[in-house]
Amino acid sequence: MSHGPSPRLAESPQLSKGSLLTILGSPSPERMGPADSLPPTPPSGTPSPGPPPALPLPPAPALLADGDWESREELRLRELEEARARAAQMEKTMRRWSDCTANWREKWSKVRAERNRAREEVRQLRQRLDALTKELAGARRERQEAQGECEARGRELARLRGARGVADQTRDGPEPEAEREPVRDVGSERPPGSQELELVESLLKSMPEESEDCWEARSLGAGGPRGSSGRQERSRLPWEDTAATEEEASKLTALRLRLDESQKVLLKEREDKLALSRNIEKLEGELSQWKIKYEELSKTKQEMLKQLSILKEAHQDELGRMSEDLEDELGARSSMDRKMAELRGEMERLQAENAAEWGRRERLETEKLGLERENKKLRAQVGDLEEALARRRRQTASALDCDLRASQAALFEKNKELADLKHVHGKLKKQFQEKVAELAHANRRVEQHEAEVKKLRLRVEELKKELAQAEDELDEAHNQARKLQRSLDEQTEQSENLQVQLEHLQSRLRRQQQNAPLFGKIRSARFGTEEAEDGTSDLDEDEDLQIQVA
């Protein structure tokens, strides 16, 4: 619907007198009614000297419309300034929100970097622990190998001693003779091989002297009063002497063979003894090396325990810092919740203001409709005035000019008022459009704020989930550290048990080394008593000396 003026009213100020007369000359019968309300004119053709009749004035709301519109414009401008201030405040709050989110991101990046650092340290500790466990396993294997070698050496020693005892028993079995006296440890400073050789040589030297003494004693005992019997015996003596010399020669050859065998056995036993001494020295060197390695392992273990304690302290410090950061974040989260509540209140207030703006808009529309109705009334009044002027022009030709001028002036004023009203209406329309655009912009901003608030809520939930994951990972790291500590304690206990076993083996080896000469002495004493009871020869002393050497 167009609200512009009608062309008849728009062109009314430019109408000439003739046109007005023609218009007034042909009045319509429908508009003749209101002429009765006009004052009567004089019957003569001359106009009355009095003032022209008063024209009907517009209603009071039309006169007071300008003041109302100015006050309304001031109110609208004030509301516009308030809306702009609110929009600036909202922008400031959104900037603060963006700064808060940036700070949160920085804090979470720091927390993630610290978490990655802690994971890297835990991984390095695991690698070091694996390397230490491998070294401990290698040390255990080497220790077990050393124990196996020690046991094998012990078995070899026992086997050699058993073989030597069996050889001694086999040597002692076929000989019927026994020693006269048990051999004692005389001249222990000399080597046992030289003592045995000297004993065998003395035995060989004493045997021919004894045979010569026996021969002289026999020859002296034969010279008696019985000469005939002596002569008979002299014929027997060469045969007996030859038999005795043959027996003694066979005994000497047997003794020499036994001497050679005993020398060979002594050489073999010396070589075995040297090899055993070398093996024992080698084992002692290996034991010293194992002791050094064990000390190094204990030192490395102490260092690892120190490092673990340092890492535990650092981890506890980091946990304290992380708990403080979490408390700060909880405080920031509570402040963010408060800000969210404030923003919600502000959004509700903006929604209420938006509703009020919509109410104002409806009121403006109603006022606009009222103005349009007033315009229609004014147009109707203008039409009535024109009809009244036409009737008066028809009634009084003399007062036509005055009435025409007055009506033209009134029409001009009315047109002027209508133009002012149109101008004000255009301004109000522009302001209304601006308000509508601002309201649409405010609605878009509110929707953007709501979307950003939703994004922030989602981000807060994601941060909560990441925080829970970080706490779970920290708990897993604690559990793994406890497991590693438990495994380290078990390994230390196993290493202590192995050390105790190694000390027991060393003490057993020392006892065996100390008991070896005592065992030889006991053997020699036992064999000496048995030979003294049997009355054996000096050849068994050689065997006792061999047993003592063993």
UniProtKB/Swiss-Prot annotation:
Biased composition (Acidic residues): 530-550
An annotated GO cellular component: myosin complex
Residue positions where Phosphoserine is found in the record: S12, S26, S28, S537
InterPro entries, sorted: Myosin_tail
Keyword Cytoplasm appears in the UniProt entry: no
Gene3D superfamilies: 1.20.5.340, 6.10.250.2420
Stretches the record annotates as Disordered: 1-69, 138-247, 472-497, 509-550
Assigned keywords, A-Z: Coiled coil, Phosphoprotein
Range of residues in the leader sequence: none
Bias kind Pro residues: ranges: 37-61
Basic and acidic residues bias locations: 138-159, 169-188
Any coiled-coil regions, as ranges: 72-161, 263-396, 427-518
Name of the protein described by the UniProt record: Coiled-coil domain-containing protein 102A
